[in-house]
Amino acid sequence: MGRSPCCDENGLKKGPWTPEEDQKLIDYIHKHGHGSWRALPKLADLNRCGKSCRLRWTNYLRPDIKRGKFSAEEEQTILHLHSILGNKWSAIATHLQGRTDNEIKNFWNTHLKKKLIQMGIDPVTHQPRTDLFASLPQLIALANLKDLIEQTSQFSSMQGEAAQLANLQYLQRMFNSSASLTNNNGNNFSPSSILDIDQHHAMNLLNSMVSWNKDQNPAFDPVLELEANDQNQDLFPLGFIIDQPTQPLQQQKYHLNNSPSELPSQGDPLLDHVPFSLQTPLNSEDHFIDNLVKHPTDHEHEHDDNPSSWVLPSLIDNNPKTVTSSLPHNNPADASSSSSYGGCEAASFYWPDICFDESLMNVIS
């Protein structure tokens, strides 16, 4: 069924040509011409088939072959001829001097065809493509997805910058607050007694606060939190401590570790620094009942060498002299102020009326 390919013969060489083979082919054609390509290999002493010799000469060894890039005029000629002739590369090559059909075909597949597709032109019919309108929603969705991915990458980078900014603002606020506290009360105490937190400790504190807020609220943003705290500094744990009237830590330790009888008197200058928020309010029912229940009796005080630091003095003093000494106070303000610090010899004469209330005694029992 037709002629068999010449390359099927046994012993013929295939693959790239060597410079020696190229020189043999050039010398033979220059002397004798190519003649019959099927008989040329034996005459030129080449172990190749006739087709391989023809393609090698036509596409590479021919002296009139034009090398280099295609010009704009050659591109327009190829496009015009392809719209008329189609993929007939040999016919197109006859209109381009020095260009081979194989070179024109490669240039079409690698450059011109892709260029037409990008311009929205069908490379076969050379007409505008109509299938673009059918795939337009998919193209728009892909474009939107690309923009979304870019925005997500930008947002992730901004989150790292926002976290660093939050750390810096938090540390700056804490250090400024400590400096202002030192300037206002520099004569009474040192800042190390109030705030002994180094930078490493502060960073750990900030990280713990941010992680806790993220667990409670996934939408937590430390930058927005800091902006809100600028309007209300009470949200900062450190700001709450600084805004309140404070006393030195040595004085707080003195008040907490000593028994009520060892507390300084009302005129002691150490009490001037005690914040009012640390004093036990008299109108607190929970503290009042707990103190009545938990306070030991006088008999227990005789055997207790180390009374608890949080125990308040007895509401009703069993010593008649003490009760009698408290009766001359006619001013309720004086009585309440004398009982604010819980001195045993300064009990208020209002307390017995409260203690003998029947409903209150039922609760205590």
Curated annotation (Swiss-Prot):
<feature type="DNA-binding region" description="H-T-H motif">
    <location>
        <begin position="89"/>
        <end position="112"/>
    </location>
</feature>
<keyword id="KW-0677">Repeat</keyword>
<protein>
    <recommendedName>
        <fullName>Transcription factor MYB93</fullName>
    </recommendedName>
</protein>
<feature type="DNA-binding region" description="H-T-H motif">
    <location>
        <begin position="37"/>
        <end position="61"/>
    </location>
</feature>
<keyword id="KW-0804">Transcription</keyword>
<feature type="domain" description="HTH myb-type 2">
    <location>
        <begin position="62"/>
        <end position="116"/>
    </location>
</feature>
<comment type="subunit">
    <text>Interacts with FBX5.</text>
</comment>
<keyword id="KW-0341">Growth regulation</keyword>
<dbReference type="GO" id="GO:0071365">
    <property type="term" value="P:cellular response to auxin stimulus"/>
</dbReference>
<dbReference type="GO" id="GO:0005634">
    <property type="term" value="C:nucleus"/>
</dbReference>
<dbReference type="InterPro" id="IPR009057">
    <property type="entry name" value="Homeodomain-like_sf"/>
</dbReference>
<dbReference type="Pfam" id="PF00249">
    <property type="entry name" value="Myb_DNA-binding"/>
</dbReference>
<dbReference type="GO" id="GO:0000976">
    <property type="term" value="F:transcription cis-regulatory region binding"/>
</dbReference>
<dbReference type="GO" id="GO:1901332">
    <property type="term" value="P:negative regulation of lateral root development"/>
</dbReference>
<dbReference type="GO" id="GO:0005737">
    <property type="term" value="C:cytoplasm"/>
</dbReference>
<keyword id="KW-0805">Transcription regulation</keyword>
<feature type="domain" description="HTH myb-type 1">
    <location>
        <begin position="9"/>
        <end position="61"/>
    </location>
</feature>
<keyword id="KW-0539">Nucleus</keyword>
<comment type="function">
    <text>Transcription factor that acts as a negative regulator of lateral root (LR) development. Required for normal auxin responses during LR development. May be part of a negative feedback loop stimulated specifically in the endodermis upon LR initiation to ensure that LRs are formed only in the correct place.</text>
</comment>
<keyword id="KW-0238">DNA-binding</keyword>
<keyword id="KW-0963">Cytoplasm</keyword>
<dbReference type="InterPro" id="IPR001005">
    <property type="entry name" value="SANT/Myb"/>
</dbReference>
<dbReference type="GO" id="GO:0003700">
    <property type="term" value="F:DNA-binding transcription factor activity"/>
</dbReference>
<dbReference type="InterPro" id="IPR017930">
    <property type="entry name" value="Myb_dom"/>
</dbReference>
<dbReference type="InterPro" id="IPR015495">
    <property type="entry name" value="Myb_TF_plants"/>
</dbReference>
